[in-house]
Amino acid sequence: NAYNGFNSAPSELHYVLDSYMTALNKGIEVHVCTDIARIENVRISPEYWAKSGLPGAPSLADVTAYTKANGTGYQMHRSDWEYVSDLLVSGYKTGVWIGREPGFADAPNAQLYEVHVDGCGNGLYVEDVNPYGILISNSSFAAGEGDNAVYFYKDFSTSVQFNGVDFNGPIVSDGRDGVISFESCTFNEYPDYALKINSGNVLLSQCDFKKSTGHVYLGADTYTLKSVNSGYKSKLQIDNHSTAADVEVITGKKYTFAPIPKNIKTNIAVHPKPASDNVLKADLARATGYNNNRPTRDVSAELQSALDAVKAAGGGTLYL
């Protein structure tokens, strides 16, 4: 447990793997990451401290009350091509926060896969995204009573795509522009509207609403709603208060497509490892100078000889 779990200051290639934490303030915070970073198999919840058995550990009710009033699970400012997979956040004021660097307009783009958030005030809070956008797939965002599964702040003006995502709770957008798209998504429980789009643009493709009413609310500044085979049994209910929105609803079997597969195993159970700790360095002929210089010598026979030497020594690693 910690006040802050992991903080990435301006840098590149951070890698947070197989981590379980209770952070009272922020679980993971990313600033100005200028090359691909990864968050994989991370759990952020008040229960880890509460159930740790450590001296002075609080009750689950007490620590959850604090994190739900103050905490953020995963906070991503500018990051260029962040990859997040198998992230679970529960019991925080904000589950996942995406937005700008403080005092600047720099924002992230990222791919999120198997991100699951529940019991948070805002499951996902999007302040802003850079022009390359955010893709979120095979994930879920669940809100408590009176909370939002997803919220888009007024600075949002680019692109977020949800594919194969389950929502419990409303999605609310006050973004000034931009496109929010939903493909093969499911909208379960929500109070009045599943989608309350006060401004901006929304696209729906083959989405399933579990209630017969309250699907989409369009505010005065909504520009576009386009829907294909979406709604309750493919019937979409729209409450249109826009001044001039372009609304198009299409249904038909010819527009049906295969949804993104679920429960895909993205990692092998046992990673390969060398038979021994032996390491052999092979210093082979190679190109010199800039990357566009071509090598002139065939080293395949020497490379095979080096591999054979490693094998004869009982296995190991060949370092080039």
Model regions and ranges:
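Extracellular beta-strand solenoids
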Residues: 8, 21, 30, 44, ...
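Detector for repetitive beta-architecture
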Residues: 3, 12-18, 25-27, 36-37, ...
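Extracellular "leader-to-stem" segments immediately downstream of a signal peptide or signal-anchor
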Residues: 1, 17, 40-42, 46-64, ...
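Extracellular beta-strand/beta-solenoid scaffold signature
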Residues: 1-7, 22-34, 52-76, 91-104, ...
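Core solenoid repeat modules with strong leucine/isoleucine-rich periodicity
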Residues: 72, 85, 109-141, 146-152, ...
